[in-house]
């Protein structure tokens, strides 16, 4: 998965950086990893703002050049410091691409491109905001995780997340339809009504019984996913139907600190169940 972007002697340092910085790989590269399919794509790395500079500096040490887009600060150190010194607003889950993203930084090396995506306060918020469920997969240092494996890997279907129609969404959905996934506006009725379905009316969380988790390291595979990834594993969500032609991956954000929050499934937030175990979140 990474050999296209890094030399052999750079892989172990990358893994150390990934663990130290909490970097998560997601996007089409991870879908290719799970399916064995191959198509042209960039490598998407997701990181919280406090670790942005360290992750970008590592890419530079591997020969990647920062390639700012129009309007971006042209020096990466200054750009990352600007974001760090300007506390991001707490985003609630919204129905447009980019929710939870502070900025995207492009790094290039020849014809290879890595996108370093700075997340405001929760990486999973960004992943759960993707256009459809087939790309809701990610890789940490020690585990590869598919959040909707039965749909994505078995039936090759993808539930479209509730996003207002726009050309970008249409193009993204068409691209994955061309790659073999059937796009669904609603979960199948039998799945939505079943407590045994990943698309049912159940509260989901990373590492639950519906996820497919592949350990990537021999030693660390002895430890459960949630023990090694507590910030990710403590988030939750649910599938909801929000209109005649739309469904959504639903959650609210509960703030823990300036640069940290958790996704909380909407039924939990509405019932304020988190208060029964002593958790205190702010949502505005």
Regions found by a protein language model. Give the residues of each.
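Short, structured coil/loop segments at alpha-helix boundaries
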Residues: 1, 7-11, 162-170
